[in-house]
A protein has these predicted regions:
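Solvent-exposed, non-transmembrane regions of integral membrane proteins
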Residues: 3-897
Length: 897
């Protein structure tokens, strides 16, 4: 008898055949429907999200032991993975399919459900185009990885074997040309000048530069790195990478298709929203806290709003105090201020620092910020309290060291540092010491630095790092003070090429340094001014004033000359930079956004009666308009600051982490202002102002903690083409929209259970949160793909599972999951907003968290912000628990009714 599993279809009767066909059709249709179902697609995206996060942590755990590439391959190349629950040594693990299997299943699900089963109508045309682009992208990545052949420098341990690839050409390196920024070892660019010998015969010259590969005979040659030839000292070697991938350009065209499809779809959705929205062009505006039957009584509502106002005011007050710490002036006898003309002239001088020309005011400002944590300090003088600028501090260090050594400009944050260096104790938590106090403990500091350096740079405590930083800042100030001493003891030593050792120069090439004065006379010229100034300190009356005026005249004459060596364009750039730091755009925007937010809250609290005078009834919409215009003004300040930075640096406005903060603040508020024109509820404007204010405050604190000039030029790999600029700007714009949606959802989750908003307002918030999330998805998805294209164009790797890449992918996967669950009707309004809050946490991880993991190409090694980031995670966790409790209580209140 034949097994039931292997029936002979030809011997069955007609009735049996029909029954079997029906069974096969039934189960086949069920399998087909399941393979293309929403549920399976959502589950696969969540699995991809979990795998991406777990794989990132896997790299952190094993990269130091087995290498980054091996750690990546051991997780993302596995057929299945076991993710430990509860820690690395947990006995319970979550089994999941590997990344490759999951991607194949997602491809099949998207092909069946997103192309074959979807209705082919103009309404779904954008979705179809986007799905087609994603399918091409997945196919290009999966097939391209299998078909790619890469030849590069390989370290081969003894006993291992290597595959040999014959290239259809030979290369000869004629010359390798590295270029560095002036005065630094930071590479600006490097190129290999080669001669190519094809198999077909002949030869021709070519150049391979960083970010500018050479394509020939189906192969792509990338400039990877360079080094010193160990066999021939003084000779340079060029490290190239050869890659052969027939599908190299598929991700690029796929990303264009995805962008067109998403923009098309969301434009159609937005158009339908505008057509459905009643009274869009009607006059008047509605602000938060609309009255309706289901809302709280008026008195309780106003008390709750007042409590929220006080809480927000307290948060911003503490933040602004932290951003601008209070001054503790010290009495400095015999202090006489520098003339304003001298300070302005000295601050406008051009110096070479960090590979670029910058004003002395910027140079001194960051040194003071690094030493004291702020850009100015207050001293007590015989004429009263006086605020000293960085330039005045620097001039005092150079020409009046007996005064400068009294200034308490060295900030110490940790008690352990005070005890280790035997410094005098102070009551303040943030202790400030003078140069004279540290000089008395010079031996202890030197001994501590020597012991710390023996430990290496890794695994140092925060106190040890602070001691090293304190010693470096002390050495800088000591070097400035030596200028005056050397000029007095040996004026001839201050020659043309000697002075720049103590004070950076205005020239680019080392040949135009301080060219205004004769070589031998420069030292004597400045020594005379310094000697006159120091003599005047011990005198009184008209004689001292005359000497000071003579000394300042000499200094003015000397300091006025170096800028003549700068070109007109350089002088304009210096003037812009001086204006930029005088403007202090982040602090101005912070104050403006807080003022606009307070105005908006006052509008919500103020509710005139129906029979009130006309002028009182217009106060509320007038206040709302004032808040909108004030927010627009703060956004304009940030936009102007970004434009000024572009003109100074001559690159895109987003080139480092600090610039992303200002860009997110600007774009987040701008997006809220635009949405507010359509919603007219005031809530999205409040969310945008909160986002802008928090971002500005974070930027101020971040700059103070890092104390690094973020306008310094970028390294060679980041001086790229259009793709890099597009990638960074696009994805950061997606960050801004995603964070705006998260802040808006925070407001909803807090206001809805407290009955501060009406039912119609809740529906409007749902639509706004959904629309902003869609906007964020467009830019995060396209920006992530653009980043892969840039990597493929620059060094031949589209995707390498780097933590920064994984963070961007996590954002995209989460937003796609939320939108698809919402489309399926499985996500209530509360869950949509709760998901946006979780999305905000994921954006924070991708934006900041991955920078602190210590692995990957984008690990910046930040340590001072880890505690703040951990506090943010805990704060969001507590808020999520609070939102759940409030929602549960609101549901119980409805059930009781």
């Amino acid at each position: 008898m034949q097994s039931a599993l292997f029936l002979d279809y030809g011997r069955l009767t007609l009735m049996d055949r029909e029954r079997m066909d029906a069974v096969l059709k039934k189960y086949g249709c069920s399998l087909w429907n399941f393979a293309g179902s929403y549920g399976l697609g959502i589950a696969l995206m969540l699995i991809l999200l979990v795998l991406t996060f777990a794989g990132t942590l896997h790299q952190v755990r094993l990269s130091s032991a087995m290498g980054s590439e091996a750690a990546i391959e051991s997780f993302f190349g596995a057929a299945y993975v076991l993710i430990p629950l509860g820690g690395e040594n947990s006995l319970i693990s979550l089994p999941l399919p590997g990344m490759g299997i999951t991607c194949v299943l997602l491809f099949a699900n998207l092909l069946i459900g997103g192309v074959f089963r979807i209705r082919w109508t103009w309404r779904h045309a954008g979705v179809l185009v986007a799905h087609g682009g994603i399918l091409l992208l997945l196919a290009g990545i999966m097939l391209g990885n299998k078909m790619t052949v890469a030849v590069e420098q390989v370290e081969l341990p003894q006993g291992d074997r290597v595959h040999e690839y014959s290239l259809p050409f030979d290369l000869r390196l004629n010359r390798f040309v590295p270029e560095f920024y002036p005065g630094t070892s930071k590479p600006k660019s490097y190129e290999s000048q080669i001669t190519v010998f094809p198999e077909s015969g002949g030869q021709y010259d070519a150049v391979i530069r960083m970010n500018e590969p050479l394509r020939l005979s189906g192969w792509t040659l990338y400039q990877m790195s360079w080094g010193q030839d160990s066999l021939h000292p003084g000779r340079l070697i060029s490290i190239l990478r050869a890659s052969h991938n027939p599908l190299e350009q598929m991700p690029k065209w796929s990303s264009y298709i995805i962008a067109i499809g998403l923009l098309w779809h969301f434009a159609c959705v937005f158009g339908r929203y505008l057509r459905r929205k009643p009274g869009l062009a009607s006059a008047g505006t509605a602000v938060t806290a609309e009255p309706q039957a289901a809302s709280a009584p008026g008195g309780k509502k106003h008390l709750r709003l007042a409590g929220i106002c006080l809480l927000v005011a307290a948060i911003f007050g503490v933040g602004m105090l932290a951003a601008r710490p209070a001054a503790h002036p010290v009495l400095v006898k015999n202090y006489v201020p520098w003339s304003p003309a001298l300070v302005e002239r000295a601050g406008a001088m051009a110096v070479l620092d960090g590979g670029r020309l910058k004003p002395v005011s910027t140079y001194a400002g960051f040194h003071l910020l690094r030493t004291l944590g702020k850009r100015s300090f207050v001293v007590d003088t015989p004429e009263g309290k006086r605020k000293l600028s960085p330039v005045e501090w620097m001039l005092d260090c150079m020409f009046r060291p007996e005064l400068a050594e009294q200034y308490p400009v060295f900030l110490v944050n940790r008690e352990e540092v005070v005890r280790r260096l035997h410094l005098p104790d102070q009551k303040d938590k943030r202790k400030k010491y003078s140069y004279a106090q540290l000089a008395e403990r010079w031996e202890e500091m030197t001994r501590a630095v020597r012991e710390i350096r023996l430990l290496g740079e890794t695994n140092l405590t925060e106190a040890q790092k602070e001691i090293l930083s304190l010693a470096r800042n002390f050495d800088v100030m000591r070097g400035w003070m030596l200028v005056s001493r050397i000029m007095l003891e040996n004026p001839a030593a201050m020659e043309r090429m000697e002075f720049p050792r103590w004070f950076p120069s205005a020239g680019r090439d080392g040949e135009r340094l301080w060219t205004a004065a004769p070589d031998k006379a420069a030292g004597a010229f400045l020594a005379m001014a310094s000697l006159l100034e120091r003599k005047a300190i011990g005198m009184e009356g008209a004689e001292a004033s005359a000497l000071r005026m003579k000394a300042e005249g000499l200094l003015l004459e000397k300091l006025a000359q170096p800028n003549e060596a700068a070109s007109a364009g350089e002088r304009h750039s210096l003037e812009r930079e001086i204006f930029y730091y005088r403007l202090d755009p982040l602090y101005i925007s912070l104050a403006v956004f807080v003022a606009a937010f307070v105005c908006l809250l006052l509008c919500a609290l103020f509710r005139p009666a129906a029979n009130a005078p006309l002028w009182r009834r217009f106060l509320r919409p007038g206040g709302f308009s004032l808040a909108w215009l004030t927010g627009a003004g703060g956004t304009g300040v940030l936009a102007a600051a970004l434009v000024i930075r572009m003109l100074i640096t001559m690159r895109s406005p987003v080139g480092n982490t600090y610039e992303t903060i200002a860009f997110i603040a600007c774009m987040g508020v701008l997006c809220a202002l635009v949405v507010e024109l359509f919603s007219k509820k005031g809530i999205v404007l409040a969310a945008g102002l909160l986002l802008g204010a928090f971002s500005c405050q974070m930027g101020i604190l971040y700059e103070a903690s890092q104390a690094v000039d973020h306008m310094d030029p970028l390294v060679a790999i980041l001086r790229s083409n259009f793709l890099l600029s597009t990638h960074v700007i696009t994805i950061v714009l997606g960050y801004a929209a995603g964070l705006l949606a998260a802040v808006l959802s925070h407001i909803y989750l807090l206001a809805s259970p407290l009955r501060l908003i009406s039912g119609k307002t809740e529906q409007s918030l749902d639509r706004m949160a959904y629309g902003i999330l869609c906007f964020s998805l467009v830019f995060t998805l396209v920006g992530t793909v653009f980043g892969g294209i840039w990597g493929n164009e620059s060094w031949g790797r589209f995707w390498g599972w780097d933590p920064k890449e994984n963070g961007a992918l996590m954002i995209v996967l989460w937003q796609l999951t939320v939108l698809h669950v919402r489309k399926a009707g499985w996500l209530s309004s509360w869950l949509l907003h709760f998901s946006n809050v979780v999305g905000g946490v994921i954006i924070a991880f991708a934006w900041w968290g991955v920078n602190m993991l210590g692995v990957g190409l984008h690990s910046y090694g930040f340590t001072s912000g880890r505690d703040a980031l951990d506090m943010f995670y805990w704060f969001e966790a507590v808020l999520c628990v609070l939102f759940i409790i409030l929602h549960y209580r609101a549901l119980r209140r409805v059930d009781v009714r």
